[in-house]
Each structure stands twice: as structure tokens, then as C-alpha cells.
């Protein structure tokens, strides 16, 4: 189910609080740019019913099923990439601070009192958007609502300043001061909310910042016109939300700006939710979920954040730049089977040596690696594993005069009849390798780490010939020119190739509940250092 209309129908039903009929759905579709009538809607609903994605409730209409909700989260990756940005802009307009605000939500499993105390620690340290919060116990779960940072964007808009949301990421703190973005994802380049991605993959350390001033805090990066600088600074003095970490006109916490921009770094509205999550409490976190009357929220004590003009220690660059640089170091020769390859690395505690090696072998036997070669070495504390990175294949093609452009990395859903990406991030729109972001989502069976490359369509025959000579398990699918591949759009005069992620063997180790510290694009080594997986 990857039709845009089907996705929109599921979206309409998911947002409804009661069953919805075909007429209301048709009207809602027209508001969203789809001019189809009730009869056509009924046809789509019939198909959705047959696939158990919706359920008919007599004359009342349809409701979305659990399977439908799950499908909505996966379907039509090209439709969802960039939708995070468009939703942010829409909600920026619909908000009306200080009366109507946009909230984030989370559901935790655990003790109400303990979770509440943890969330309030973040507020008291100042790491929240505003001083409003709802936290309630519902059965065995604790629900938490915090203000979204888009609320501040709405505040700027109401004061005549147009903000442009660009990135979500994590900011490194030293001695209680923000020093640099450690990682960012462009809202326009991702199928998933950047802050949710960083939080759920364990990339934050808000507790560390609260307790000793060292750690990583979720943050958003906006730009505003440079001509509004004086007006912006006046607004900051009366800012009731007190959520600006830093701002400036040059290298703001490592982020590049053009001469007509001011960069603004906002603490993420999800930050208070990180404290219980980092403490091990199971969480279901959603960003910018709904608009709410601020009068229905409770005021809490909030520590003061001082907005500072601050440059970063280093400039944040997209991972694509690193990939293209590393690609140049690859000189593996297909005929001689000699030369440099790029490897990913994993560090596993030595007490898990036997289990880790078994998991690695299992991955290779199931063709979840680039080739049949890897390197394993042990010291007193760790087993260190090295697997060939998928970038090596790009480098091999480049050495043979075929320009291969890394495009997206993400999670590929693998079924007998179809393969499709269910999450993806553009390599040009992130400073972190997407496979690091999605590492915990791979299960080595139904969901694997994979990537998309773009190649000129005139190079199709030569690429296929070289791939056969290479003889590796690197390419999952070769697309047709001017056609989507695994649900991802490829431009005119190009074709796509889907490549298996070189970190899948490490994801298989993690799936077996073995702790693993993983790095992508780690270094170049000589192919002769690698051995067949049977020999490790």
C-alpha cells in the first residue's frame, strides 16, 4: 500500500476521534489537494478494508485499525521524506501562543512519582520550552506532555519575524555551556523527526548535563533574516518560553550560515522526556502531536537559560562529504582482489566473544554482509570486528570510471514479494551516518540496514557487468532508469541501486542482546587483512 491517496485516507482516519464517512473523507482529501469524489473514496476504502487497514462500522463510517496505524508509519517513503518539514511549517501557522500551543507527548512504563521527579529535573535545570507541563498516570502508564519548540517559532511569527526550521540535532555541553552541535539531521531530508531519532537511538545525555555540565542535549536549529536582528534581541528580553541556547550570524555552534541569516539554537521541547528514557524507562515518544489550549496545562518551576552569541569549536558537515572523501581512498582491484577497502568497526566486551562470533557468522551465512570477508581481533577487554563498508563498492565503481552518488540510507523492509524502504535519511542532509541513526531498528530478517545510490542511466550495462565480476553480496536490487527503487524516487536520466548495509552483522550482534559500540566509515585497510568468515 503505497498510493498517496491511500496514505492520506489513513492519515485522515488516524487524526479522527470517531468513525468517518466517505463524504467527510472526500472533503478532507480536497483540502489536501486530491480532487476525488465519494465514489472513488469508497473504492479506496474497500481496498483498505480488504487489507485489514481500516474497519467499517456500519453507517457510522470507517476507523483505522492497528495494522493501518503500523502501515501509515511505514508506507510511501518518498511521500514521507520532507513531510516532517511541511508539518512543522503548518503547525507553526496553526499555533497561537500564548493561548493555543503545540505539544509533544510521551508514554512511559514505570512509577509515576519517579518519572515525574525525573522530568521536573530537566525543567528545574532550565532545559525545557517554557514552564508548562502535563503529567498524569493512566493505568500502568505515565503520560507526559511538554511544549514543542515550534511554539517559539509561532511567537516569532506573531512578532513579524519569519523563522525557517532547518535541523534537529544534539548539542554537546561542557562546563554547563553549549559548545557545538554533535550531530544534525535536516528536516527536509528525513522520514523521521530528527529529535525522536536521536533520542530513541540513545544519542542524548541530558542527565550528564544536569549533574555535571557534560553531555548532549536535543536542540533545533532555525534561521531568521539578518535584517531582524535588533527586533529579535528585543523579543528575547520578553521571551516567556526562555528556550534559546545560542544565536548569532556566523558558525553558531558549528552551523554554517549565509550572510543574510541569523542562526538560532533552541532547546528541544522533548528534552525533559530524555531523563526517564536515559534512566531505562520504556518510552513511546512523539513530537509535535497536537494543538492544545495552554490553560489546560500546569505551570512548573523552570530554571533560567541565558541565550548567548556563541561560535562552535568546529563546523558541522554532511556525512556525504566524508563519504566522498573516503571513496577516493578505495583502490581495490576486481581482477587482482587486492587494494584498500573502507571498513566499519564494532567493539564488543570480550566476555561475549563466542556469542558475538556466532552472530557474525550467522549474518554472513544469511548474506547480510557486503562480501564473505571480515577481520576479528581480540585484546584483554574487547573483541574488535571489521566489516567492509558499502562505500567500498562505490569506490570500486568509481575506480572503473562510473560515478556513483550515495543518496539515502535507512531501513529496508524485506518481504517475499516486495522490498521497500520504511525509513530513510538523505546523506546530504545529515552529519551522522543514517545507519547509526537506525541501528537499533534492524532485526536482520524483516528489517535490514540498506542504502540507495544514484548512477547515470548510460552506465547501466557497465555497472551490471562490473558487479558480476566483483561477485560480492553488495547490491540487493538494480532499478530501471527514470523509475523509483524500493519506493525511493530517482531523478530523470538516473537509475538507482539498493545496497546492503555493511553494519548489518553488528546489528545482528545487538539483536542478540550483546552490547556493541559501532562506528561507520571508520578507516581504510588492505583487503589482505580480511579473512573468510568461516575462518574467524
From Swiss-Prot:
Pfam families: HTH_12, NRD1_2. Under nitrogen limitation, binding of the intracellular nitrogen metabolite 2-oxoglutarate to NrpR decreases the binding affinity of NrpR to DNA, leading to initiation of transcription. Residues 7-72 are annotated as: Winged helix-turn-helix. Gene3D superfamilies: mj0159-like, Winged helix-like DNA-binding domain superfamily/Winged helix DNA-binding domain. Keywords: DNA-binding, Repeat, Repressor, Transcription, Transcription regulation. This is Global nitrogen regulator NrpR. Transcriptional repressor of nitrogen fixation and assimilation genes. Binds to two tandem operators in the glnA and nif promoters, thereby blocking transcription of the genes. The gene is nrpR. Disruption phenotype: Disruption results in slower growth with ammonia, but does not affect growth under nitrogen-fixing conditions. Residues 315-536 are annotated as: NRD 2. Belongs to the NrpR family.
Amino acid at each position: 500500500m503505497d498510493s498517496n491517496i491511500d496514505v492520506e485516507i489513513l492519515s485522515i482516519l488516524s487524526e479522527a476521534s470517531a468513525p468517518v464517512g466517505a463524504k467527510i473523507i472526500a472533503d478532507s482529501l480536497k483540502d489536501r489537494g486530491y480532487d476525488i469524489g465519494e465514489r472513488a473514496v469508497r473504492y479506496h476504502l474497500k481496498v483498505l478494508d480488504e487489507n485489514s487497514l481500516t474497519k467499517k462500522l456500519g453507517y457510522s463510517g470507517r476507523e483505522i485499525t492497528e495494522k493501518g496505524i503500523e502501515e501509515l508509519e511505514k508506507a510511501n517513503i518518498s511521500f514521507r521524506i520532507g513531510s516532517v518539514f511541511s508539518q512543522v511549517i503548518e503547525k507553526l501557522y496553526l499555533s497561537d501562543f500564548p493561548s493555543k500551543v503545540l505539544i509533544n507527548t510521551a508514554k512511559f512504563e514505570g512509577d509515576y512519582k519517579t518519572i515525574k521527579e525525573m522530568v521536573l529535573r530537566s525543567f528545574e535545570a532550565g532545559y525545557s520550552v517554557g514552564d508548562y507541563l502535563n503529567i498524569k498516570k493512566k493505568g500502568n502508564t505515565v503520560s507526559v506532555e511538554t511544549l514543542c519548540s515550534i511554539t517559539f517559532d509561532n511567537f516569532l511569527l506573531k512578532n513579524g519575524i519569519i523563522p525557517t526550521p532547518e535541523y534537529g540535532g544534539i548539542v554537546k555541553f561542557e562546563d554547563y555551556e553549549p559548545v557545538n552541535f554533535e550531530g544534525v539531521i535536516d528536516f527536509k531530508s528525513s522520514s523521521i523527526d530528527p529529535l525522536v531519532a536521536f533520542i530513541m537511538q540513545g544519542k542524548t545525555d541530558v542527565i550528564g548535563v544536569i549533574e555535571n555540565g557534560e553531555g548532549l542535549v536535543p536542540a533545533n536549529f532555525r534561521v531568521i533574516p539578518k535584517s531582524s536582528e535588533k527586533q529579535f534581541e528585543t523579543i528575547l528580553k520578553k521571551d516567556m518560553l526562555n528556550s534559546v541556547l545560542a544565536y548569532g550570524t556566523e558558525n553558531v555552534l558549528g552551523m554554517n550560515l549565509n550572510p543574510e541569516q541569523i542562526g538560532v539554537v533552541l532547546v528541544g521541547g522533548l528534552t525533559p522526556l530524555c531523563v526517564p528514557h536515559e534512566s531505562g524507562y520504556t518510552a513511546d515518544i512523539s513530537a509535535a502531536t497536537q494543538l492544545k489550549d495552554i490553560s489546560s496545562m500546569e505551570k512548573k518551576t523552570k530554571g533560567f537559560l541565558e541565550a548567548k552569541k556563541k561560535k562552535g569549536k568546529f563546523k558541522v558537515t554532511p556525512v556525504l562529504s566524508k563519504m566522498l572523501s573516503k571513496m577516493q581512498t578505495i583502490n581495490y582491484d576486481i581482477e587482482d582482489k587486492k587494494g584498500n577497502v573502507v571498513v566499519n568497526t564494532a567493539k564488543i566486551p570480550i566476555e561475549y566473544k563466542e556469542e558475538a562470533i556466532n552472530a557474525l557468522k550467522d549474518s554472513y551465512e544469511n548474506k547480510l554482509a557486503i562480501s564473505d570477508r571480515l577481520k576479528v581481533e581480540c585484546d584483554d577487554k574487547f573483541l574488535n570486528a571489521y566489516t567492509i563498508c558499502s562505500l567500498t563498492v562505490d569506490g570500486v565503481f568509481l575506480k572503473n570510471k562510473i560515478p556513483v552518488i550515495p543518496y539515502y540510507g535507512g531501513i529496508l523492509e524485506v518481504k517475499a514479494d516486495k522490498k521497500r524502504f520504511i525509513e530513510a535519511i538523505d546523506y546530504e542532509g545529515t552529519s551522522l551516518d543514517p545507519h547509526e541513526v537506525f541501528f537499533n531498528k534492524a532485526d536482520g530478517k524483516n528489517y535490514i540496514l540498506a542504502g540507495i545510490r544514484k548512477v547515470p542511466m548510460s552506465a547501466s550495462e557497465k555497472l551490471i557487468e562490473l558487479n558480476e565480476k566483483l561477485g560480492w553480496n553488495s547490491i540487493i536490487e538494480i532499478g530501471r532508469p527514470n523509475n523509483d527503487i524500493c519506493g525511493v524516487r530517482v531523478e530523470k536520466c538516473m537509475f538507482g541501486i539498493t545496497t546492503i548495509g555493511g553494519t548489518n552483522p553488528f546489528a545482528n550482534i545487538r539483536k542478540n542482546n550483546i552490547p556493541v559500540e559501532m562506528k561507520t566509515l571508520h578507516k581504510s585497510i588492505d583487503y589482505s587483512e580480511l579473512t573468510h568468515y568461516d575462518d574467524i
